Amino acid sequence: MIIDAHSHILSLAADPQFTVDYGREGSLCIYRSMGRLPSHRLPTEEEWEASGFARSGWPLIGPAESRRDHPGFDKIVVLAVSPQYLEGRLIGTVDTSGQLGVDGPPDPEKCNDYIAAVVRAEPGLFVGFASVNPAFRGPAAAVAELERAVTELGLAGLKLYPMYQHWAANDRDLAFPVYRKAADLGIPVMIHQAGSTRIDAKLELGRPALLDDIGREFRDLTVIIAHCGLPWVDEALFLLTKHPNFYAELSYLIATLTRRDLFLFLHRCEPAFVPLEKIFFGTDYPGFLYDPVKLRDKLMGVNEEAAVVSLPPVPAQKLDGIMGDNFAAVLGLGGT
């Protein structure tokens, strides 16, 4: 089974100009490293246009586009982005096209309704994860929305964004009621405990070590560390060593590694007491270096590096597990 365990869909705001500016901020480091934008100052509009990131070229990613860009995938996990205020705008997952049939104007407070509509469009392909922000309307409202998203909308998991929304993952007053509800509902929780190049994100709130309190308190809650904690990868891996209910997915990290480095990374997991069954493939699609096919092929081709570095190949069954079977087992989807 081939599963993208981390992807996004639709838009982030009803204002298309803001959506482009947000995308530009996130991609600035990538374009600078490629030499397509100046490294020492902010680009001009003309330089953005020349780089290929034109305002008019920002695409809407709907179910059809996601399916098109994931050929051969059995499942695509689509993650909601819960509402928050940024630069005076309310942002979060919205359907600016109206193609999904959710009533009313685009509204980030309907983020889970939009993701549920994506799943209904192709229930055999898409797996929806809800999102809530306990700092937005308080933990009681977040808990109620999570219950609605799972019991009424049928979403299969929860994605949280502490560093972007400026709350700590181990905040007992804000976050623990959400974890308790997720545990009661029997759903996995994926948490962005990793870095971000966005100026407004708080790096101190992205450290994977903040999840240790969750592992100590909620031993029956499945916790997935997004992006394998990059840049704190070793910290994330040690949490997988310590807590039997912790997992990690590879999006973002896999895009920064060469195929050889990815092979070496997989080889060092088990000597560090991290079973490869705890690792999931993900892409963070539709980000700019996050082509699902290229990243899938990078992972499936790692054993071509074995002879070069004089190490044994990663067993095919373990690669198949990372590619999808591990995640399928956690969600009860069944493997192939």
Regions of interest found by a model, annotated:
Residues 6, 115, 149, 158, ...:
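Conserved, mostly hydrophobic/aromatic
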Residues 59-65, 110-115, 142-145, 208-211, ...:
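Alpha-helical scaffolding within the catalytic cores
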